[in-house]
Amino acid sequence: MLQPKRRKYRKEQKGRNTGIATRGNAVSFGEFGLKAVGRGRLTARQIEAARRAMTRHIKRGGRIWIRIFPDKPISQKPAEVRMGNGKGNPEYYVAEIQPGKMLYEMDGVSEELAREAFRLAAAKLPLKTTFIVRQLGA
């Protein structure tokens, strides 16, 4: 699963996920893309589950790019532990997603195969997404 190799600090504050994606919002590598319409967090497990769904559908053809990386640690306290005594330990990593962010890209397959693969992947994600085709000259 995806997670940072090293971090300057183990824990991070919660923060707020506001605004729209101004970077990483266009199809850059492949011919087709899966773009976020909604806002939220994607865990490393969700990113991997969607990748597997796409890979299984396109079989041996095509190439997939993952355009997001889970670099924010989410800490949790164990079950049935009283409040206080400091912040919990990092349990998993998430990627904060703004509307307009390109999540995955694909190339080397037909449009209908890519559309179906992205539909299967989108079912694994907690965000609303849309299918994008690269525009000529863009």
From Swiss-Prot:
SUPFAM superfamilies: Ribosomal protein L16p/L10e
Disordered: region residues: 1-20
Keyword tRNA-binding included in the entry's annotation: yes
Coiled coil residues, start to end: none
Pfam families reported for this sequence: Ribosomal_L16 (PF00252)
A GO MF label: rRNA binding
Gene3D superfamilies in UniProt: Ribosomal protein L10e/L16
Keywords in alphabetical order: Ribonucleoprotein, Ribosomal protein, RNA-binding, rRNA-binding, tRNA-binding
Gene Ontology biological process terms, A to Z: translation
Residue ranges with Basic residues bias: 1-13
GO cellular component, one term: cytosolic large ribosomal subunit
Domain of life where this protein originates: Bacteria
UniProt xrefs under NCBIfam families: rplP_bact
Known partners and oligomeric status: Part of the 50S ribosomal subunit.
Family: Belongs to the universal ribosomal protein uL16 family.
Function in brief: Binds 23S rRNA and is also seen to make contacts with the A and possibly P site tRNAs.
Protein name according to UniProt: Large ribosomal subunit protein uL16
Source species of the chain: Burkholderia mallei (strain ATCC 23344)
